[in-house]
Amino acid sequence: DAIKESAFTILGKPILFKYDMWTDDASSHEPEEVQCGFVPKDEKDADIQFEYDKDLGKTFLTVNAYLWNVYQEDLIRILQRDDGYKNVSVEMWLIEYDESTKEEKGYITVNQFVYNGITILGSSVTEACEGADMQVVKFSYDDYQKAQLQFEARLNNSINQESDEDSFLIQ
């Protein structure tokens, strides 16, 4: 229930990335992370959905987001090399939680939280929540141009004028 109640807080949040030159890959949660994209503020553009994974026994939030090509050459190259797939981890503030379950279950029960961002992880970094990943769904130039035109039309009508210039769609 907490994931569904907090889902709307992902809207407008940044996608974060730090390049690790030693592994030629993304890093992890680091103070030097930079914003490389965003989740749209508009619910329709973000297309928030919930998918239950039978094998993992978990419900995942899925959302559309955009990554910028400009200034992110390393990330683009990494995504092309890795077939557009990377594990991710979310950054969040816990609002309401129960620490009494930590000893018995090995984790605290989170009842309410707010998303702060999504971090792209390197291949050598294990995601905190197994199955948390991203997949580039639009990487071709033609698909990018179509998505860009649709997105720009919506974005130009928004109050906060984010730019999707030189970006592509991920989910």
Report each predicted region and the residues it spans.
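Flexible, gly/proline-biased loop segments at the beginnings
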Residues: 1-77, 102-105
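Acidic, proline-/serine-/threonine-rich low-complexity intrinsically disordered repeat tracts
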Residues: 161-164
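C-terminal assembly interfaces
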Residues: 170-171
